[in-house]
A protein has these predicted regions:
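Conserved acetyl-CoA-binding loop of GNAT-fold acetyltransferases
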Residues: 422-432
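Conserved GNAT acetyl-CoA-binding A-motif
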Residues: 400-415
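Short amphipathic alpha-helix that is part of the acyltransferase structural core
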Residues: 307-337, 447-448
Length: 455
């Protein structure tokens, strides 16, 4: 009986913990629900997404967005399905810069493939979990042709025939249907003013629709976690100019998949440059990524925006308590020296922080030792924002600040982050290379390694 009681108590405690986490998440998500309500989101669904094991869950999550008042436009492609059809017919696929040449005799078959995928999306919103979100009225999905297409023409000497591009968006029709509380679905098939049928690129269509509607968000569902840096780490925030650099790097690849992803980044940046508030690049290969990106502060993909949601700014007196909470776990592990709140308040002018919607998620400090030498210290990032490039961003900012102040060299002391500093072009040096007054402050018990870098 005793064992049963202990097991029961443990189960109750575990249940309470899970319930508490769910309640906390829901409470924290309320501000996002309120901010998203009434906004227009354009969602890009690659053809590959249809084969994801989480496609049903994605449709349910889109229905959830619709149920809280988000105005949704879905744009889907059909690249892999079309490729499979070519392979079955033993037909050669001609590519140029990741674009497919669509022959006149093939466009009817392609239209049929695309129509089947559109019907699949339509059916999924009428069944399963998606349908249960609004049992009274259901989700009214409108499959339409909300654009006028034109031929892509001849590029690099290649006639793309029935491969097209957007001529203009029928924005009034889109707005009318959105005002009628409809969920809109646009495929990658478009028609010209003369009635010709064209095969278009879904990311181009989505971008032009998002710009025309002045959408709050464009969300690109793709098969990777987002944009990565040269070391392969996820970059969770980019401005449009930085995005364009990443796009150029990816598009220079001879691999078709990387070139295509570069194109997605390029269009995502264009959307922001032309008035869309934010674009998100997230992975459809994991469950719940859309919800995590839109309803949590840490997100899970790459956000492209002119308005930096993770603001890098000078430290303020009011930040001292949050900085203390941020660095305390590192102090307890012996990775940072102990600092009091009073000390942080007195040194706050030396700090730079990354402020994510009112929460300090990373910090670092710069101290000038001489006219030409400065120390960077107290680099810390919260656990849930690790591996997102925040430390590198702070380091770059402090390096620029030091350079502007006439500093020619910066140094750091570290017990465990030696490799990270080496990756960022620091070189190990001796204690004797530091000024005498700084040598006297060296902790002989911690025995930190010293690294230096020219700026």
């Amino acid at each position: 009986m005793k064992n049963y009681s202990e097991h029961k108590d443990a189960t109750v405690k575990k249940s309470k913990t899970v319930d508490s986490q769910s309640i906390d998440w829901f409470r924290n998500s309320t501000r996002y629900i309120n901010s998203h309500r009434g906004c227009t989101f354009v969602i890009v669904i690659e053809g590959e997404t249809f084969d994801s094991p989480y496609f049903t869950e994605l449709i349910s999550d889109l229905a959830l967005l619709k149920s809280i008042g988000v105005r949704l436009v879905l744009v889907h492609g059909a690249r892999p399905q079309i490729s499979k059809a070519y392979n079955r017919c033993d037909t050669e696929i001609i590519y140029n810069e990741s674009m497919t040449v669509t022959k006149k005799e093939e466009i009817d078959a392609i239209s049929g493939i695309v129509g089947t995928l559109s019907s699949k999306i339509d059916a999924m919103f009428l069944s399963g979990r998606a349908a249960k979100l609004d049992q009274n009225n259901g989700i009214q999905l409108i499959r339409g042709n909300f654009l006028v297409a034109k031929p892509l023409g001849i590029k690099n000497g290649i006639d793309f025939q029935q491969t097209g591009k957007v001529r203009h968006i029928q924005v009034d029709l889109l707005r009318k249907q959105l005002d009628n509380d409809c969920l809109l679905l646009q495929s990658n098939i478009g028609y010209s003013v003369t009635g010709e049928v064209f095969n278009l690129c879904e990311i181009e269509i989505a971008t032009e629709i998002a710009i025309a509607l002045k959408a709050e968000k464009m969300i690109v569902m793709t098969d990777c976690d987002g944009v990565t840096d040269s070391q392969g780490a996820l970059v969770d925030y980019l401005g449009p100019d930085e995005s364009s650099l990443h796009a150029s790097r990816m598009k220079s690849s001879e691999k078709g998949k990387e070139h295509l992803f570069g194109k997605q980044i390029e269009y995502s940046a264009r959307a922001v440059q032309c008035g869309v508030n934010r674009t998100h690049i997230i992975n459809y290969c994991s469950d719940g990524t859309l919800i995590r990106e839109l309803f949590t502060s840490e997100g899970c993909g790459t956000l492209i925006s002119k308005d930096d949601s993770k603001k890098l700014r000078k430290g303020r007196i009011s930040d001292a308590s949050e900085i203390l909470n941020l660095i305390r776990p590192l102090e307890e592990k012996g990775l940072l020296i102990s600092r009091s709140k009073e000390f942080l308040e007195s040194e706050i002018d030396h700090f730079r922080v990354i402020d994510l919607e009112g929460e300090i998620v990373a910090c670092a400090a710069l101290h000038l030792e001489t006219d030409t030498l400065a120390e960077i210290s107290c680099i810390a990032t919260s656990d849930k924002h690790q591996n997102k490039g925040l430390g590198k961003r702070l380091l770059n900012s402090l390096e620029s600040q030091a350079k502007n102040a006439g500093i020619t060299e910066i140094f750091v002391l570290t017990t465990e982050a030696a490799h990270w500093f080496i990756e960022n072009n620091f070189k190990e040096t001796s204690l004797e290379s530091l000024p005498k007054n700084r040598q006297l402050l060296y902790d002989t018990i911690r025995k930190s390694k010293i690294f230096i870098k020219k700026v």
